[in-house]
Each structure stands twice: as structure tokens, then as C-alpha cells.
């Protein structure tokens, strides 16, 4: 018996997206495309049972960005330093230390997201040197 509210285990990001309401599916697919456009070699996986993208080869958990669907928004988790770097541009979005909420009923800020993803990737690569 599954606990009420327990998140199922998904095999793939496609499974995760397919399990969401139609409105969330559309935004998740769009966000996924934006991430892959920004970093084409990002590896997709599930982490904490939600879609994650490793931005560098064999990247650890803190070298990934994640996304998750909620009732009224998509949570995007690019890392605290990324949120800090783009805080002025995120002023119209609810955001915390390492996350930002993109409402389902508003267009995604495609250019901003691409720049955030590239910033995080470049930050990771710089730390590796």
C-alpha cells in the first residue's frame, strides 16, 4: 500500500513528466528543452525522485540542476550561487536560497534560464581547474 502523498519511483524523466497534469507536462518539457539547449551534453537522470541534469561529465549532486512540478508552479533548482548571481533578474519570481518558482500560468523566461544554466556549468568547470 502506497502512503497518501508518497512520491512514486520513476524510471525516467519521461515517466516523471507523463505522471504530471497536462499544464505541468508542457512547462516541464519546455524547461527541459531550454536546459538541453543551453548545455547540449547535459546528462539526464532522476535525483531525489525528480528530473535532474548533470552539467559536467560524471557530475555529483551539487553539480546538477533539478526541476519539479507542483500544483501551481515548476520548481527550478540551479544552486544557491546561481540564484545569488541572478537575484536582480529573479525579483519577479518567488525564489529561495537555491530555488526559483516559475508559475504554470506564465511564460518561462527562456533567455534567463539559459544564462543561469550556462553560468552554473561554467562555475563548476572553473572549480575543477
Report the location of each language-model feature.
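Charge-dense, helix-prone N-terminal extensions
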Residues: 1-129
